[in-house]
Amino acid sequence: MEQFDCGDCDLNDFIVHDAEAYSAAKLAVTYVMYAKANAKHVAAYFSLANDRVSLIDFESKTEFNRFRRHRFPNEKRLKSYPAVKLCRLGVDLADRKLSIGTFILNFIKSYFTRDNRTGCRFIT
C-alpha cells in the first residue's frame, strides 16, 4: 500500500496509516481493489460508513418536507432516514483512465439498491 498514489496526500495517507484503525473502531470499512495484472498493486480503494439524511441537511423544514413527501407515504415520514456514506474514494494515478472510479460508484449504488443489504435508500 505504501506505493499507492492517487494525487491527494490525505487519501494516500488514509489508506496507509488510518484505514485499519477506522475499521477496528467501527467508524468506516475500507475496501481495496487490486490490479488484475499485478495482485500487489492497489488500483483503488473506497471507505463506507453509516449515515443519515435528516432535517438539518436541508435549508428549511419546508424543503425537507418536500423531499419526504415525494419519496415516502405519510406513515413512513420520519425525522431522519438511514443512508450509507462514501467517505473516501481514491484511484491510483497509474489506473486513472480505466474508469475504475465509475465502476466503484456503480457497484456501491447497486450493492445498496438492488440487494438492499442494510435497509437504506440514500448514499451521501
PLM region spans:
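A short, internal acetyl-CoA/4′-phosphopantetheine-binding micro-motif in the GNAT/acyltransferase core
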Residues: 87-97
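Conserved GNAT acetyl-CoA-binding A-motif
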Residues: 105, 112-124
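Conserved acyl-donor/pantetheine-binding loop and adjacent beta-alpha core of acyl/acetyltransferases
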Residues: 45-88
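Conserved beta-hairpin
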Residues: 26-47, 60-62
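Residue-level recognition of the N-termini of beta-strands and the immediately preceding loop/turn
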Residues: 29-31, 82, 120-123
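Short amphipathic alpha-helix that is part of the acyltransferase structural core
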Residues: 1-21, 25, 41
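Conserved acetyl-CoA-binding loop-helix of GNAT-fold acetyltransferases
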Residues: 97-111
